[in-house]
Amino acid sequence: MGLWMIQSVRRELGEQTGTRPSFPELIAAAQEASSFAGIVSTGDDRFLAPKSMIKEVKAACKDGGKPVPATSGEVMQTIYNSLSHDYQAAIQELQSLTGKEYTSINIVGGGSQDMYLNQMTANATQLPVFAGPTEGTALGNLMVQMIRAGEFKDLADARASIKKSFTILECDPQ
């Protein structure tokens, strides 16, 4: 589900108040509620297209016997708790299926800018998170084309060029 839940809450809060909160404002609200322990399964179909993401998060908490968020900050913290928990479960499942032990997580695209989620993911997985570049999809496409055209000798060469050309932020587990 990823950042869809966050985007939906942002849109909904904007409709309620007439002013759409910024992502930094949503993060600040979540941080103020950082001790809130609500959690839901972000992969649940109920979050695909609810009329109200806020009400759906609250209902899922209630249905799961978890603390029900009362503020927008608690709703946001529930989503952050849930995403980082689900990322940790996905890493465990991936390691189990592949027999490989992963030593880090790379996050690209717009979500790589959410350093609060990146830090929570590092903490939940106990793996360092490397965030960026934000234009990961376009760069990946370009990288493949440049490898094919002989501009890079292989994937490792292309990755090294990306790493030298863009800022990649690191979040270590705490």
Go through the PLM ranges and name each one.
Residues 1-104, 113-137, 143-173:
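Active-site core segments that coordinate phosphate-bearing ligands/cofactors
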Residues 110:
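Glycine-rich Rossmann-fold phosphate-binding loop(s) that bind the pyrophosphate
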